[in-house]
Amino acid sequence: MTRKLEEDMKRPEEKLCAIVKKENVILNKDMSKEVSFKVGGMADAFVVPENLNELCNIIKLLREEDIEYFVMGNGSNFIITDKGYHGVIVKISPKYFGEIKMIKFDDECEIEVEAGILMSTLSRELVKESVAGFEFASGIPGTIGGAVFMNAGAYGGEMQDIVQSVKVIDERGDTKVISASEMEFSYRNSRLQRTKEIVISVKMLLKRGNREEIKRKIAQLTKKRNEKQPVNFPSAG
């Protein structure tokens, strides 16, 4: 970071530290340690909010200060150039945004999950509860927030098939709920890529199933994925 950029970041850094713990604000962050490709340059600043209030206040601050920022999940499917990122990276960490709420009906199951939960973690929890309909996503890398952002899918299923609504932070830093019909889902795309709204939680409708059948289907899909993809090497995820 140049001296000018250091000076430019000093005041926002102090304000960020007033919102989150000081140890959760890192200057000159090596982003190769945060992305699945394991390459890339430095970010001017890296901040990790621990709750929704902190996240909203961070976004409001960055917009008020007209500071470039990027919100990431677990670091899959994107990369920072070797020249670095001249702005603030905000990480929605699985550690702080990974809660699952589940309501079971006779044949269906409505779940609401926070954006930071890993797809693999959610898949395991749903298997434990004998909830079906998420098998296609069991091997998709990253977080549920990222999956909704890009309408992730595999083996005939997509996020748009199960999403009911999405809670986001809008351009003003306020929260609102977007219905599935308003999400403008298409192949590997959603309105979020245009609006820059930030996913904070997702409500999905799944169904009850047989645990052993669910596990068997996931095992079959995992085998296919391992046969076709370089799972032991750094990649998009």
Language model feature labels by segment:
Residues 119, 123, 137, 141, ...:
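Hydrophobic, well-ordered secondary-structure segments
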Residues 13, 55-59, 123, 163, ...:
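A generic alpha-helix structural signal
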Residues 8-144:
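Anion-binding (especially nucleotide phosphate/pyrophosphate-binding) glycine-rich loop
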Residues 21, 33, 43, 74, ...:
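A generic structural signal for well-ordered coil/turn residues at beta-strand boundaries
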Residues 1-7:
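N-terminal amphipathic/basic-hydrophobic helices that include classical n-h-c signal peptides
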Residues 41, 47-52, 79-98, 149-179, ...:
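Structural signature of FAD isoalloxazine-binding scaffolds in flavoprotein oxidoreductases
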Residues 26-27, 36, 78, 169-171, ...:
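Phosphate/pyrophosphate- and phosphate-bearing ligand-binding catalytic cores of soluble enzymes
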Residues 77-78, 123-126, 134-138, 151-158, ...:
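A generic local secondary-structure boundary/capping motif
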